[in-house]
């Protein structure tokens, strides 16, 4: 269902400006593959991928957002290269330009999760450099916190599901507690060590969606 995307059309010059698929990409693909049967049966109507994309194509309406216009351009070519229908590609941060409040049923986010100085995080996002794909500010959570703060207003009230990549430094257990305290169900669906990184994929969902995914 979710093969590793073919990016052979992209060159080393492209990867000076666009994030190259790496272990965080692959663990997210594997987590979605593990849930593939439930997701296909679930038939999400609206899917949104934010930032580093895995080129998922299991929804009727598919949106991708990124602050980097070169990343969106590369994504358009990659969808074509892999024989996938073109999504709606939108240059924005998170969901700022979208009017899809409480409509997103499947949200996929591989954020910039590396702990950096907040100044480096701000500079990377302001300059739209490649480091914006990994520089995460304090605890590597600056952008993730912005999304989680808005999650109740983003996800569909019954069917909303978020797949989120995190590393140990992001304190996944604290993310889970925070989201459970906010009325969501949250679990680690996959974790893996890749070099110095301890990667996790969290599934954060509305209670009714969680029940379906656990069947």
State the predicted function of each range.
Residues 1-215:
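Auxiliary N-terminal substrate/complex-recognition segments of SAM-dependent methyltransferases
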